[in-house]
């Protein structure tokens, strides 16, 4: 459960990210593919090379979904319901992949905003990404 301090940390960090969210989403997705090659199996139709426009575009979709989740932190299940359905019923993404991407998102944010990436912010973002992952995998049961 996200505390009020966690919510403040997440919103503040996301505000600082601003217009870079899509760029960071693409970078985190590429980092996921490089670090965890099995994640590539869900994207056989993508050009997965460094700097791929398809990876960047999908990374922007990820970032947009997270931006929506930040705006609706008090109702993540409602905000992410359609995305949860898509990943559970149509795409059938292995739930572990959300954790892997979350890790790569944390690394990407830490690389771009080291001064703001305090232990408290790290913990809050980790809890937030975990909450998002939990919602996205809730329909698997």
Curated annotation (Swiss-Prot):
Domain Globin: 1-141
Residues annotated for O2 binding in this entry: 58
The keyword Plastid appears for this protein: no
Residues where Phosphothreonine is found: 8, 108, 134, 137
N-terminal signal peptide: none
Keywords: Acetylation, Heme, Iron, Metal-binding, Oxygen transport, Phosphoprotein, Transport
Gene3D superfamilies (alphabetical): Globins (1.10.490.10)
Tissue expression per record: Red blood cells.
Binding annotation for heme b: 87
Molecular functions (GO terms): haptoglobin binding; heme binding; iron ion binding; organic acid binding; oxygen binding; oxygen carrier activity; peroxidase activity
Residues modified as N6-succinyllysine: 7, 11, 16, 40
Positions of modified residues (Phosphoserine): 3, 35, 49, 102, 124, 138
Cellular component terms (Gene Ontology): blood microparticle; haptoglobin-hemoglobin complex; hemoglobin complex
Alphabetized PROSITE patterns for the sequence: GLOBIN
List of residues that carry N6-acetyllysine: 16
Phosphotyrosine modified-residue sites: 24
GO biological process, one term: hydrogen peroxide catabolic process
InterPro entries: Globin, Globin-like_sf, Globin/Proto, Hemoglobin_a-typ, Hemoglobin_oxygen_transport, Hemoglobin_pi
Similarity comment: Belongs to the globin family.
Subunit and partners: Heterotetramer of two alpha chains and two beta chains.
Role, per record: Involved in oxygen transport from the lung to the various peripheral tissues.
Protein name as it appears in the record: Hemoglobin subunit alpha
UniProt organism field: Lutra lutra (European river otter)
Originating gene: HBA
